[in-house]
Amino acid sequence: MSHSNLLLGAHTSAAGGVYRALLEGKKIGATTIQFFTSNQKQWKGRQFTTNDIELWQSTLKETNLTHLMSHDSYLINLGCPNQENLLKSRQAFQEEVIRCTQLGINYLNFHPGASLGEDVQKCLDSIVESLLLVRPFIQGNLRLLLEATAGQGTSVGHKFEQLAYIINGVKDELPIGVCIDTCHIFVAGYDIRTSSAWDFTLKGFDRIIGLPYLYAFHINDSSKDLGSRVDRHQPLGEGKIGWESFEFLMKDSRTRHLPKYLETPGGVDLWEKEIQKLKEFA
């Protein structure tokens, strides 16, 4: 796999129009991007005009980016025990699926949900039910990706077993997979600091979930310790995970080809340098 074929990018800004996320991706030397299709802190989502979609399509052709990923709203909790907020979450998620379909996006990355102190098993069952409700709206190449979480607060999805439970509940009905956030799984208790640690963790993932369900990575270092369950991203090589971990991801045959999206604090100037450094490892 040549450097030009490596799928590397970052979470770029769609402020002023979704097409701008593509332009920012090109600016940092990315071959792929993640972005918000709508304001991530509002229930009411953006509705695309014909002009929005045409501008997106023409910019996409110019930039030649592939394996595009949307990140859903932070407000959405598909396992919410509060019925009113669960219904709002399901509606917002459905709208997100529709926007992704309109843009021809490949992946919709989402945080599974949070139990808010209620029964965790009920939360997981509610997430499965919520996902099955969007089945009629999924078209084209869109695949839903569960993001492995940090386990902060009452969020679920920080254990591979929880992700496997959700996948097993929907895999026969809709396209599903996992996006591993390196910071998240590290603070959730999975050691990835060395090649041997990564190998052990990937073998565990394969045993519990199955490597064919691993579709993407969020690439972040962590300012917090292994197992701390506190989600704080750091620039690559400046946190508790370290460069060996990211070098492994760029070299190992199980992970090298998968899309990787930076969410490190520092913005476009840092991302350009980090993408270059990751390419050098490959």
From Swiss-Prot:
Its protein name is: Probable endonuclease 4
**E.C. number(s) listed in UniProt:** 3.1.21.2
Q: Which gene encodes it?
A: nfo
Q: Which GO terms describe its molecular function?
A: deoxyribonuclease IV (phage-T4-induced) activity; DNA binding; DNA-(apurinic or apyrimidinic site) endonuclease activity; phosphoric diester hydrolase activity; zinc ion binding
Q: Which Gene3D superfamilies match?
A: Divalent-metal-dependent TIM barrel enzymes
Binding locations of Zn(2+) 2: E147, D181, H218, E263
Q: Which InterPro entries would you find in this protein's record?
A: AP_endonuc_2, AP_endonuc_F2_Zn_BS, Xyl_isomerase-like_sf, Xyl_isomerase-like_TIM-brl
Recorded family membership:
Belongs to the AP endonuclease 2 family.
Note the SMART domains from the entry. Answer: AP2Ec
**Residues that coordinate or bind Zn(2+) 3:** H184, D231, H233
Offer one Pfam family short name for this entry.
AP_endonuc_2
Record the organism.
Answer: Protochlamydia amoebophila (strain UWE25)
Which intervals of the chain form a coiled coil? Answer: none
